Amino acid sequence: MTLTARISLLAASAVLLTGMFHNHLVKATPSAGETLSASPAEIRLWFNERPEIPFTSVTLLRADSSKIVTIKAIATTDSLAVAALLPSPLPPGDYLVNWRTASRDGHAIRGTYGFSISP
């Protein structure tokens, strides 16, 4: 194997290994695209690794991207999940959930998904 090929292989391996340590969302309730018949009491997020609670938050937005509230996430009995308790019931409409956490390597991880509440 040539030196260039070895360096390329090592670089590709490093990129793959770095990506393995990044946290990502596995599941959420309400889930992406879900239509609910009533307001949820909380937003619950599950990750592939334990989220860093001090760096985890959920921002709830209206469909037009106007902010409703940012909620500090709290730990749950499942170490891979966090909950964001809603301060009051949501009226019918379309919503966006912006979540943020950190991987154990310190990288900030973010995501957005939407859900609806039917009238």
Language model segments and positions:
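Bacterial N-terminal signal peptides
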Residues: 8-18
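A glycine-anchored, Pro-Gly-centered beta-turn/N-cap motif
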Residues: 39, 86, 91-94, 100
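Proline/serine/threonine-rich low-complexity linkers at boundaries of modular beta-sandwich domains
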Residues: 16-27
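Short, surface-exposed alpha-helix to beta-strand junction/turn motifs within ectodomains of secreted
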Residues: 43-45, 49-68
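Short, exposed beta-strand-loop hairpins at the edges of beta-sheets
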Residues: 87, 98-112
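Solvent-exposed serine/threonine-rich low-complexity stretches and specific carbohydrate-binding patches
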Residues: 68-77
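Extended, polar beta-sheet/loop recognition surfaces of beta-rich domains
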Residues: 36-38, 42-49, 106-119
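Aromatic sugar-binding surface patches on proteins
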Residues: 77-84
